[in-house]
Amino acid sequence: VKDELEGTVYCCFEEGEESNGGIATMMKALEKYTVDECFALHVYNALEVGKISMVAGPRMAGAVRFDMTFHGRAGHGSRPDLSINPIVPAAHMVGELDSALRNQLNAESIATLGLCTFRAGDTWNIIPETAFLSGSARYFDKEAGPQVLDLIKKSAEATASIHRCTVTYEPTTKVILEPVINDPAVAARVSDGLAEMCGADVLDQDCGRWYASETFSRYMEKCPGALGLLGIKNEKLGSGAPHHNGKFDLDEHAMVLGACSELVFALKN
């Protein structure tokens, strides 16, 4: 196969794709290379093993991350009027954010909200000094990212003010990743090549886009590319639980189709 290649294939392996754990180092390393096109795979629990989704257009979501701390004034729980309880605005934000996104953003922006961390206090009778809230919002419209971030901050500041609190943000509160939008030409070339090598039945045309996020969008700033979703679900084996669930597992037979897709990309480029 190597004799059939015209050019050079670079293989990239990175850590922490949603958290941007390794992408800055990777992009710096790629500066000295000329890259024409890029390709990536992500295992996907909703697809049966032996299937791959390789289609044009939006495939994985962009992400806004927020890490905010509400500041009040600590005191005894018996006299909340003499304290300023930061838990109150933080708790209001749990419902407020979802309502704000639904009512103030274009419905076609399809933003979703995930509230994943709420920390405040350490005992039953003391009002704490601070309350911490973090999570993310996902979107497929590139223009939605800054709008979502602005709306989150305005909602937090207004809610904090109503309850006599202030709010601060960690530097991580920002648009962390843009949507992965497959280039039509690259996606079609890989899809056609897979049909030729493995048969058209391996291609899943009905797989919806995925709301998780990927640093592959950063690679696509450098050159056109496409990302495939590789099926790993096998009920007989017991695989197919949601990603980041304690029961998550994969059918390793899926890796064969994954390797074939990478080979097709290299040969058809």
For every predicted segment, state its role:
Residues 2-128, 214:
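Histidine/acidic-residue-rich, glycine-tolerant segments that coordinate divalent metal ions
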Residues 88-269:
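Metal-dependent amide/peptide-bond hydrolase catalytic core
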